[in-house]
Amino acid sequence: MQHTVDIQAIESKLNFTFSHPRLLITALTHPSYRNEFPSAEEDSERLEFLGDAVLGLVVTEHLFLLFPALNEGLLSTTRAALVNAEACFEYTQKLSLGEHLLIGRGEKMQSHRGKISAYANLLEAILGAVYLDGGLSPARQIIVPLLPDKESILPLMLVNPKNRLQQFTQQTLKVLPSYKALPWKSEDGSPGYHVQVFVNGDLWGEGFAGSKKEAEKLAAKQALSTHDNKN
């Protein structure tokens, strides 16, 4: 049995009225639902693709204006924290949109991870629909109030030691750290990376790990522990 969509309830939650309600219905239609009900003309996948770009643009613009002195690297990593699946899941929860998702009975959403993915995709699809129907302005008006305030965003930048080190060297020395990765093997012979971090040509820290990303974090953490008295 196909389900009906309470368009007015969703529009009330979004504070946006669709000129073309079919866009909203498409945004709510999970691919698994269309598989069970072929009469559903289109599923949400294309709108998800568009909505992902809309979300990224709005969040990028918001951070750009909110933090005028922030460099590109920190802007990028902070944006990533605000547009990932977990963040989008939280935004969907805030708007209570999940209950409107049209999803097939056979689709597994028992796991928390499955629910996060489905709800994140739903948010992106709805943003894509809003953008097509009304442009960027209403999409912005939906997204920005969902974002953390400035004081809550700041810690997101500093969770990663690489971000903290970059902020520290820029503030104190007006330079960026550089990383050099070398092949490395652990005691059991597993391949990995030996990463060195340099500031002004001086070696500040080293890290050893199975992945280059983790080795860079460890090197940055060591650099902070020896050069930043606040850490």
UniProtKB/Swiss-Prot annotation:
Q: Which residues form the RNase III domain?
A: 7-135
Pfam families linked: dsrm, Ribonucleas_3_3
Q: Where does Mg(2+) bind?
A: E48, N121, E124
Q: Where in the cell is it found?
A: Cytoplasm
Chief localization: cytoplasm
Q: Any transmembrane segments, and where?
A: none
Q: Which reaction does it catalyse?
A: Endonucleolytic cleavage to 5'-phosphomonoester
The record's annotation in SMART domains points to: DSRM, RIBOc
Q: What is its EC number?
A: 3.1.26.3
Q: Which PROSITE patterns match?
A: DS_RBD, RNASE_3_1, RNASE_3_2
Which UniProt key words apply to this protein? Cytoplasm, Endonuclease, Hydrolase, Magnesium, Metal-binding, mRNA processing, Nuclease, RNA-binding, rRNA processing, rRNA-binding, tRNA processing
Q: Where is it found, in Gene Ontology cellular component terms?
A: cytosol
Residues annotated as domain DRBM: 160-229
Q: What does this protein do?
A: Digests double-stranded RNA. Involved in the processing of primary rRNA transcript to yield the immediate precursors to the large and small rRNAs (23S and 16S). Processes some mRNAs, and tRNAs when they are encoded in the rRNA operon. Processes pre-crRNA and tracrRNA of type II CRISPR loci if present in the organism.
Protein's name according to its UniProt entry = Ribonuclease 3
This chain's source organism reads Chlamydia trachomatis serovar D (strain ATCC VR-885 / DSM 19411 / UW-3/Cx)
